[in-house]
Amino acid sequence: MSYSRFGREAEYAAGSCLTNCGWAVFFSKGSRGPADIVASRDNTLLLIQVKSSTKIPKIRGSEIQNLIQMSEKISNSYPLLSFVHPHIECNVNNNSIIFGNYLINFFILPQWESVDFLK
């Protein structure tokens, strides 16, 4: 599987997971811009950058800063980072979500606090 295909599948997995949790999900065309996914529910927006890898996902500091700056310009919005890995036997943390063949984690920035969407 190509890296770009895996990345697209990871975005759809993260988006589908959010949809199952009651969020309306919109994907960035071509994954251009700071957010790959915008999710909306009850006047709250989540601006989400998705990173996927079979190892440790790579993210540049500028990507994080751009996402945070974007969220600062939009009221009631929160910048999140989502890590998507092929399903493995160990969880990254207590809020890891097993979704199909993937293990998904969401972190709110800039605090890097894990988000539990299953509550």
Labelled PLM ranges:
Residues T54-Q65:
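Active-site-adjacent loop/helix micro-motif of nuclease/hydrolase catalytic cores
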Residues A14, L18, I37-A39, N43-T54:
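Conserved catalytic cores of phosphodiester-cleaving nucleases, focusing on short active-site segments
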Residues R5, N76-K119:
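Domain-level recognition of nuclease-like catalytic cores that cleave nucleotide substrates
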Residues Q69-N76:
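Arginine/glycine-rich "motif VI" loop of SF2 helicases in the C-terminal RecA-like domain
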Residues M1-S28:
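Acidic-basic catalytic patches of nuclease active cores, encompassing PD-(D/E)XK
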Residues P34-A35, T44-L45, N76-L80:
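Short, surface-exposed beta-edge/turn micro-motifs
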Residues N20-P34, V38-D42:
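Active-site metal-binding core of divalent-cation-utilizing nuclease and nuclease-like domains
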